[in-house]
Amino acid sequence: MLILGSHVSLKGNDMFYGSVLEALEYNANTMMVYTGAPQNTIRKPIETMKIEEAHALMKEKGIDLNHVVVHAPYIINLCNPDPERRAFAVEFLTKEVIRVGQMGINQMVLHPGSAVGGNREEAVQWISEGLNQIIDNTKSYNVRIALETMAGKGNEIGKTFEEIKAIIDGVDDKSRVSVCFDTCHVHDAGYDVIHDLDKTLQLFDDIVGLNYISVVHVNDSKNELGASKDRHENIGFGYIGYDALLKVIYHEAFKEIPKILETPYVNDKPPYKLEIQMIKDRVFDNELKTKLEK
C-alpha cells in the first residue's frame, strides 16, 4: 500500500480533527501537522486539540495513526552557542515531544539546527547533548525524533550524511532517533537522486543505515544539484523531475514509511489533491499548475 500524504494545517476550532478532514480532501492516507504555528512556540492547551475526534475519524477512514507525523517548529536551534537559548530549545522540545505523545503520534521531524558562528563539530555535539536531555525527559513517551536531511543553506547542520551519523552516534538511546529523508534537501546538498538514486541510498546505508529513515519528504527543487538553496517546487516542475521522484516514492526501501508532500501552493491553492492523484496515476500532468491557477 502506498503511504502518501502532505502537510496539513490545524483548522481553527476543529484543530487536529480539522487536519484529518483536510487530509481526506486530498485523498491522502497519512499527513504531517504542526502542533501550533511553525514560526513560534505558542501552543494552545492540549485539551483543545480535539484528539479523540481526530482518532475516531482516522479509524473510520483507514488512516493509520502510526503513519502520521508532526514537524517541530523551524525556529528551535539545539546548537545555538548561547547556553540559555540551548536550554530553552531543550525545554520547549521536551514539551513538544510530550504534546506529540499525547496526540498519539510516534514521530516528530526536527531540523537539526544551525551552527551560529560556524563551528560545526561543536554544533553536532550540542545537538546530540540536547537530544539526550529531551529523550531523558520524555522516557514515558515512545516518540522518535526524526532528524531531517538539510540542504546546507547558511550554516545548517545535517547537509551531509556524515553529520547526521555524527549526531546519532552521540545519542544514547538510538531507538528514539530516526531520519527524515527530504528529496529537495538531499538534491540541493549535492546527492544525486535523479540518475543515481540507488547509489545515493547505498551511500546513506553505508554511512547512517537505511533502517533509520522513518519518513520521506517528497519535494521537487527549484535549484540545480548542489545549490544549497532549499527552495521547494511542485512535483515534476523542478530540477529533480517527476520520474526521479516517482522512483523515490515507490522505492522498496520506503514502502512501509510515510511519504509527505511539502510542495508550494499555486495561486494560494494547495496542490496536494492533484499531486497525490498524479503520483497514484504514475503519469505526469503538465497542466497541474494551470488547473490551480484558474
Swiss-Prot record:
Binding-site positions, Zn(2+) 3? H185, D230, H232
A GO molecular function held by the record: phosphoric diester hydrolase activity
GO biological process terms, semicolon-separated:
base-excision repair
CDD domains recorded: AP2Ec
Give me the comment on cofactor binding.
Answer: Binds 3 Zn(2+) ions.
Name the cofactor(s) required for activity, per the record: Zn(2+)
User: Which NCBIfam families does this UniProt record tie to the protein?
Assistant: nfo, PRK01060.1-1
Spell out the protein name for this chain: Probable endonuclease 4
Supply the source organism's classification.
Bacteria, Bacillati, Mycoplasmatota, Mollicutes, Acholeplasmatales
